[in-house]
Amino acid sequence: MRVLAAALAVTVVAGAAAAKGPVSDVRDALERIKDDSTIELVTTGRKTGKEHVRPIWFVVDQAKILVQAGKDGKTDWYLNLLKNPEALLRAVGNIRLRVRATPVTDAKRVEGIHRLFLRKYMTARLLSWFGSSIGRGKPVELEPIGLADR
């Protein structure tokens, strides 16, 4: 029953996104995805050169997509972005964005990003009360550089 409910929810969301028609520009894409819970981040493997796909939490802020790497930045996708900062984001409704990644190191900005994640994601907020570092990873700004075909 849970699987059926989840499948129905995905179908409804996908149908609603598709009903809005094609994405006109980057601003339109950001507006459509901002309330989604996850997005697919597609990086190029730093060792293999192959496509590496990872669903990831994100926040849209100031026309940029913000993501965070857990494990103190020792995740494949984060290390891939350090080597090749150009990536692709895929979202529900056939939304595709080409992005350029920049790690965030300014302490004030990092703390602000952590607050945005805790505000958007209840799970991170609840776990933070128990000492979890979820929602407090190494932040990366993904600046949209255009819509993508694939």
Model-derived segments and spans:
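Short beta-strand segments
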Residues: 36-70, 87, 97
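Covalent nucleotidyltransferase core used to form phosphodiester bonds in nucleic acids
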Residues: 29-31, 66-79
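Positively charged n-region of N-terminal signal peptides that target proteins for export
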Residues: 1-3
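Sec/Tat signal peptide C-region and signal peptidase I cleavage site
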Residues: 15-19
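Short, basic/aromatic recognition patches
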Residues: 23-34, 38-39
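Short, structured beta-strand-loop surface elements
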Residues: 20-21, 72-150
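Bacterial N-terminal signal peptides
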Residues: 5-14
